[in-house]
């Protein structure tokens, strides 16, 4: 933070202006709750991934194919990173995640994005789970993302996530 302030001061000095700042808010980093994650992982394994149909796979392939070459290259790289190069063609042919990826407390992936859940996590136990609701490698903030959120794929993902969250809440209270 202090480096950013120094950069702003330097810019003001270079332009013959002045600067001041007021720290009105800050966001705390995300604090994973491993105990809740272990409960949710067991519930996710029990509920299972959404059950996709051939029509779902066809629709997902259409969305995947609609990305430009640069995005498709990034998606291929992401698939290789998650599933391994030996499964690339399999995943591309059926580009909906049909697996529950087991929780590994030594391998917590925090993806980019903006959220205030870090602040919440310091006040109350917080859990973040991920369920497929769009094609593998989907690119956020695109028309493809918007369209997929209104599709049967997203509806199945939503229902599956709801079951996982409900079962996790029940198991947490038991």
Please give the residue ranges for each predicted region.
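Metal-dependent amide/peptide-bond hydrolase catalytic core
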Residues: 1-174
